[in-house]
Amino acid sequence: IFPGLGQWYNKSPLWKIGLFSGIEVVSILSGMQWVKKADKIRVDYELFADGNWDLETWVYNTLSTPIGNYADVHIDGTHKLTLKLSGALAEQFGTYVTSDSLEDNAHWVYTGEVSVLRDRDFYENIGKYDQFVGGWTDCYGQGNNQQWFEVYKDVGDSVETIITTPSKEDYVDQRAQSNDYLNMAKFAISAVMFNHVISAMDAVWSTQSSNRPKKEKKVKTDVGLLYDKFSRFGVGGVSISLYW
C-alpha cells in the first residue's frame, strides 16, 4: 500500500497524509537520481581506464622496471585478470586463460592474439590492487622519468604502502564518487522501507483509535520485518497482522 493512503482512508490530517506520501516520492526519486549519477560516473571511469591502462604496459613495467621490485607487484599474484586469446594461441590454449599465464609467456602480449577481458572484476582490480599498477600508462613519462609514487595508509595496527600513479589516483577517486552515490541510493531504499512500516503502523493505530469507542472488541496488531537470506539487507518485506 502506498504510504499516506491508509491515512487518507482514516481521514487523518492532511499534514500526515502529505508527510508519508512526500517521503515516499522524494525517497524514490532521489534514489533513482543517485543511481543514474553513479552509473554515469561508472561509464566515465571505465572509459578512462580503457584509455589509460594497458596489458602490454602492465607486463613490461612489472617484469622490466623497478616498480616490479615491490612484493605485491608481480604477474602471478593473488588476484587475476581474465585474458581472451585468439588465433594460434586460442587453438592451443583455449579462448580464455588467466593473467598468471603471462608469468612464463610474457611474449604473448606482443603477438596481437591476447587481450584483457574488461569486465567488472577488471575495473575493480586495476584500481584496488598494487599487483596491477604497472599497467597504468603514466607509470613513466615520455623521458622515461618515474611518475609512480608511494602512498602510506594507516590501517590501525600498521601502515600500508600503496603504489600509485596520477591516473590511478584519478581513477580511484572516480570510483569512490560513484560508490558514494550508490550508498546514498541504498539509504533512500531504506527510507522507503521504514516509511512503509511507520505509515502502516500509524494507519493501524488510527483504525484502532477510531473503532474503539464503537466496539468492545480490541484490535491487536503485530508488525514485523520478514527475513530473506537472499536479500542484500536480509529484509524481504514487512509483515502486518491484525487480531480481533
Residue ranges and their predicted role:
Residues 1, 18-32, 188-201:
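Hydrophobic alpha-helical topogenic segments used for membrane insertion/localization
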Residues 3-4, 174:
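Solvent-exposed, amphipathic alpha-helical segments
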Residues 37-50:
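Alpha-helical transmembrane signal-anchor/signal-peptide segments
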Residues 6-9, 242-244:
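Outer-membrane beta-barrel proteins
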Residues 4-5, 226:
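Extracellular loop and loop/strand-boundary signature of outer-membrane beta-barrel proteins
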Residues 8-14, 29-40, 198-213:
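Short hydrophobic alpha-helical membrane-entry/anchor segments
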